[in-house]
């Protein structure tokens, strides 16, 4: 094996090339690789945080939805109670108004009946007076009396 100057020159050139690469090429490559590794690690950490945040947000949304349903049910229940109360109040007021109208109607009927009775008494009294006048005008005849009384009864 022959060691000639070419082999030594190539070895020296290779050593200079390796030194040059280690000094000027290798550090920027390592920095780029480390930066990429850091970005990937940060991205994975952010993804994990995002997943956890999403789970928390979903749990919170579920809780809020449950609370909203409970609140809605309470509001509906209160509305139904209020509706029943209003209906009951309306029934009570309607019953009171009905009783008032019935009492007023009965009072009006009673007043009208009393007025009619009074008018009837006046008419009966007038007829009795007219009958007595007719009886007195005629002679005192039992047949005539009976006839006049029958006419009065028919008029009444």
From Swiss-Prot:
Bilayer topology term: Single-pass membrane protein
Quaternary organization: F-type ATPases have 2 components, F(1) - the catalytic core - and F(0) - the membrane proton channel. F(1) has five subunits: alpha(3), beta(3), gamma(1), delta(1), epsilon(1). F(0) has three main subunits: a(1), b(2) and c(10-14). The alpha and beta chains form an alternating ring which encloses part of the gamma chain. F(1) is attached to F(0) by a central stalk formed by the gamma and epsilon chains, while a peripheral stalk is formed by the delta and b chains.
UniProt KW keywords: ATP synthesis, Cell inner membrane, Cell membrane, CF(0), Hydrogen ion transport, Ion transport, Membrane, Transmembrane, Transmembrane helix, Transport
Top-level taxon in the UniProt lineage: Bacteria
Ion transport found in the keyword field: yes
Record family assignment: Belongs to the ATPase B chain family.
Any one GO cellular component localisation term in the record: plasma membrane
Name of the molecule in the record: ATP synthase subunit b
Gene3D superfamilies, alphabetized: F1F0 ATP synthase subunit B, membrane domain
Its job: F(1)F(0) ATP synthase produces ATP from ADP in the presence of a proton or sodium gradient. F-type ATPases consist of two structural domains, F(1) containing the extramembraneous catalytic core and F(0) containing the membrane proton channel, linked together by a central stalk and a peripheral stalk. During catalysis, ATP synthesis in the catalytic domain of F(1) is coupled via a rotary mechanism of the central stalk subunits to proton translocation. Component of the F(0) channel, it forms part of the peripheral stalk, linking F(1) to F(0).
Cysteine pairings via disulfide bonds: none
InterPro entries the record matches: ATP_synth_B-like_membr_sf, ATP_synth_b/b'su_bac/chlpt, ATP_synth_F0_bsu_bac, ATP_synthase_B_chain
Subcellular location: Cell inner membrane
Ranges that cross the membrane: 7-27
GO molecular function, a single term: proton-transporting ATP synthase activity, rotational mechanism
Chief localization: membrane
């Amino acid at each position: 094996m022959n060691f000639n100057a070419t082999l030594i020159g190539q070895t020296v050139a290779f050593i200079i090339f390796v030194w040059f690469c280690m000094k000027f090429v290798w550090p920027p490559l390592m920095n780029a690789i480390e930066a990429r590794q850091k970005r990937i690690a940060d991205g994975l950490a952010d993804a994990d945080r995002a997943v956890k945040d999403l789970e928390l947000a979903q749990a919170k949304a579920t809780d809020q939805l449950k609370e909203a349903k409970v609140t809605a049910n309470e509001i509906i229940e209160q509305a139904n109670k209020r509706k029943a109360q209003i209906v009951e109040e309306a029934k009570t007021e309607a019953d009171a108004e009905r009783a008032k109208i019935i009492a007023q109607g009965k009072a009006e009927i009673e007043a009208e009946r009393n007025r009619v009775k009074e008018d009837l008494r006046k008419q009966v009294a007038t007829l009795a007076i007219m009958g007595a006048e007719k009886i007195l005008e005629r002679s005192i005849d039992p047949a005539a009396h009976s006839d006049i009384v029958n006419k009065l009864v028919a008029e009444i």
